[in-house]
Regions:
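Short loop/turn motifs enriched for small/polar and acidic residues
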Residues: 10, 61, 124
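Conserved polar catalytic motif of the HATPase_c/GHKL fold
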Residues: 11, 15
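Short helix-loop "hinge" at the ATP-lid/N-box region of the Bergerat-fold HATPase_c
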Residues: 16-20
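Residue-level signal for alpha-helical context at structural boundaries
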Residues: 23, 30-31, 120, 128
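Glycine-rich/acidic phosphate-handling loop/turn and adjacent ATP-lid/helix
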Residues: 25-96
Length: 129
């Protein structure tokens, strides 16, 4: 399902920019979203000289049995295992569900390498067609 794959890929790319390259914490994003100033803060941080050259890189490999996506950002990483499952404590928060939803709807598997700034996601055969 290309729409489901696109959802997951978009989620990982946006996370790489916001949380990785721009250093926006979960708590900061929650507050900014609740105060309707999230986009202006992302724009402000994106324009900061320290962030101008930062990139999120996506590569993929299609094989007969799966597609493997590799997404890397230039951030400090994060405790990604905390976000693989939907957490009822975050159910009413404006953010914090994207990785779990991506894992459920878009990918056969997802994990992070290194400090958490390198995601590896796979799409299984049923989703490759």
């Amino acid at each position: 399902n290309s729409e489901a794959a696109l959802f997951g890929i978009s989620e990982l790319l946006v996370n790489g920019v916001e949380h990785g390259n721009l250093g926006l914490s979960y708590e900061e994003k929650s507050q900014l979203a609740l105060n309707n100033c999230w986009k202006s803060e992302v724009d402000r941080r994106s324009a900061h000289p320290d962030n101008l050259g930062k990139r999120v890189r996506l590569s993929f490999r299609r094989e007969s049995h799966q597609i493997t996506l590799r997404i890397a950002d230039e951030g400090r990483g994060f405790a990604w295992r905390n976000y693989l499952e939907l957490d009822p404590r975050r159910a009413s928060e404006p953010n914090g569900r994207g990785i779990a939803l991506s894992r459920m709807l878009s990918f056969s598997s997802i994990h992070y390498e290194g400090c958490g700034n390198f995601a590896v996601a796979t799409i299984a055969p049923l989703n490759c067609q």
